[in-house]
Amino acid sequence: MAIASFQKPDVKIFYNGVDKTDEFHWSNITIEDYEGDLSDRFIATMLWDNARPRMKDEIKVFINGYFLGKFIISAIRVDYKKSFDIEAVSVDFMSDFTKRKNRTFKDKSYKEIIEEIAKENGYKTKIDFKRMDEVNLLEQYDESDMNVCNKIAKDLELSFCVKNGYLIFFDRDDESHRINYFYNADDMISLSYEKKEKEVYQSCEVRWHSTKYARYKVARVGTKEPVLKITSLQKDESTALRLAEARLKSQKNLEINGNFSIIGTPFFAGAFINIKFDDTLTKKFLITKITHTINTNWLTSAEFI
């Protein structure tokens, strides 16, 4: 494969909003960016004599002028008198966002519920999905706000993530919210993928809770086997049936998993990568994880489906 030349990247570090690039003496930086609900991570290996950071302080990273993320310091690991590592994450796991709570969201839309959770935890929101104005009754019993967000996303077939101070929700099948990248396979440092057949469910059963009758009921789409069975926070049969239909529709009988590495590029997880192969055929994939490795060079690696 043809490979472009490596160049030393221009890295800028903002610490609690102040440019501390000249005081941030690092030898290696790794940034992990996920498409789903996993927390993005920033890891920097620092020279031993560098000033020690404080837990929960904020780090923003720019490479070659591109903003690559905002993170909260969550751990410091020491290799005595040699170096120390700073680990920072996009979600503060010691905050109220991850602590268990008990409450009821009554007569509120999904959008209002998400906005209330965001406001309580100091986040902004980016919300755009078909059912966001649907009024619901949602019970939060011994669950964290993050778990509630995950449940809403799972039940409504949404893409959900916490990035750069935002709670982001949109329909998983809505491509208008996803960036499209284009890359020639021959210009990649490495590219590998696997194809395999996957079982396709012919029917779907959704177990939902009826508040009117105070018991669980089952809504089903399809009559054939095999059957996908799920439990949902849906509160009526019509929304449970819509969920079942969405789950069946989202299935794929051919599963593709792959990865590639390229010269450092400001790609982000959740985007589409359109890869042009040597037979002039272009295939579109969803990037599920991006890893940026920065030292004297900048390498970008990705996982896709």
Give residue spans per PLM region.
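Short beta-strand-centered interaction patches in the first periplasmic/extracellular domains
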Residues: 2, 83, 90-92, 127-197
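An acidic/polar, Gly/Ser/Thr-rich interaction patch typically located in mid-to-C-terminal regions
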Residues: 25-52, 189-305
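Assembly/oligomerization scaffold segments
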Residues: 1-95
